[in-house]
C-alpha cells in the first residue's frame, strides 16, 4: 500500500535533511543535572576536548586493550552481589532480635517481583503493592520492630539479607519505606534509589512540610487519607520499577530524536509565548521530551519530569481532551512547594505542559495554549512529530547490526540516553528482559570506583558488553560467539554514528527567558 502524499512529504523531509549543528544559546544551561546543581552550559578544556566533544574509540589492534578484553571475557569472578549492609556495626542484641522477628515476615511476597511497603513511624500502613492486604499488619509490625531495634542503638539500618531475599530500608520521617527483593545482582544502593523515587512520588501530591505538620498536630492520623489520591500513581510506579524502566534506572531522560532545526522551530514558538508568571513550557510525546523553554535559573531534575510524565501518560487521570490545572510538587526542585501545572493533550499521545508558581493564572495559560496549538496545527508540525516518534519507536537504528543485537548509550554530559527500537523475535526475550539486563549492567558500572572501565560477560547465549567513561556509558548485547575484535569494530561503528547524529539524538541546548 502506497503512503499518502502527506506522509510521503513528511518522510522525505525527515530522512533526507542533512544534520544541522545548532549554535549554543548564550543564556542556555544544562537541561538536566543528576546532582540537581544549578550550572551553566559546561565549558570544555583543551585536555578534555576529545572526551567531551567527541566519542573515543577502542583500538582493536592495540595489544594491551585486546588482552584486557580477553582477560575480562574469561574472568570467572562472580558478579556484584547484594550483601548485608548496615551503616554502622550492629550489636549482638539487635542481631538476635532480627532473627526472632524474621519468622513473622512472609518473604514469599518477593519471589517473582519486588515488593514495596510504606508505613508511618507510628506503625500505620500507608501503601504497598501487595495484592493481599490481610498480611500487611504482621509484616509492618515485624519490620517496624527491626528498624526500631537499630534506632534505639542510634544506628541506621539500610539493608540486610535473609533467606533468598534482600531487604532495604529508607527512613524519611515520618515515613518508613521498605523494599523486599529476591536475591539479585542489583546493589542495595540501586534498590534504595527505587524507594527514594517512591517517596518523591508521595511528595508530588502532598509536600513534606504539609505531611509533617499534619502528624505533629495529630500523631495517629491515617496518612492514607492524605495521600489516597496518589495511590494509583504509586501502583503504576511500582509496576514500572519492576519492569526496569530506563528513565528511573539511569536517572536521565530520553528525548525524541529530531532534526535540530525542527526542534529549534518548536522551541522558538514556545519562547514567543512566555507570560510573566510562567516557569517553563515543554512539549512531550509518549513520555519523551520534544523541546523545552524555562526560566533562566530554574533547573529541573530527570526524576521530577519522569514522575510528571508518569501521571500524564501512564494513567487515565489526565490523558483526555480536557484542560487540567493542578498543583504538583517537584520534590527534587523543592519538596515544600507546589508548581501549578497546566496540561493539554494536542492529540492522544502529545501533550503541552506549562508550569507557574501562581495559582490564579489558569486563563493566562489557556490563552498561551490556544496560540501554540493553532500555530502547530497550521504548520503541520503535530503530524510530523507523530511520524518521527513512530519511526523511531519501530525502526531500529543499529549501525552495529547484525553483530550487536541492541545497545544503550547514556550521555553523562546531557543526562540523556538513547536506545533504538527493537522487535523481539524470541518469545522469552522481551522489553522487560532487555531493560533488566541494562539495569544490572548500569548498576555495576555506576559503582565502579574508576571513571574508565570495560566489562564483558557471557550469559548463556549472550555477550554483555559495558564501556564506561567520564562522559558516557555504553552497553550492548551481542551473540556469545562474537570475537572481541569484531565486537570492538562494531562498537566503534555505533559510537561514530552517535557522534555524527548527536544534535539529533540529544537536546544539546535549551532556551531560557
Swiss-Prot record:
| Region span, Disordered | 1-26
Any idea which UniProt keywords this protein has?
Answer: Autophagy, Endosome, Membrane, Protein transport, Transport, Vacuole
What is the predominant subcellular site recorded for this chain? membrane
Superkingdom, taxonomy of origin: Eukaryota
Q: Which GO terms describe its cellular component?
A: cell division site; cytosol; fungal-type vacuole membrane; multivesicular body membrane; nucleus
What is the recorded membrane topology of this protein? Peripheral membrane protein
Q: Name one GO biological process term.
A: autophagy
Q: Does the keyword Zinc apply?
A: no
Q: Where in the cell is it found?
A: Endosome, Multivesicular body membrane; Prevacuolar compartment membrane; Vacuole membrane
Per the entry, what this protein does is: In complex with CCZ1, is required for multiple vacuole delivery pathways including the cytoplasm to vacuole transport (Cvt), autophagy, pexophagy and endocytosis. The MON1-CCZ1 complex acts at the fusion of vesicles with the vacuole, through its regulation of the SNARE complex during the coordinated priming and docking stages of fusion, and particularly at the stage of tethering/docking.
Q: Which family does it belong to?
A: Belongs to the MON1/SAND family.
| Protein name (Swiss-Prot/TrEMBL) | Vacuolar fusion protein mon1
Look up and give the organism this protein is from: Schizosaccharomyces pombe (strain 972 / ATCC 24843) (Fission yeast)
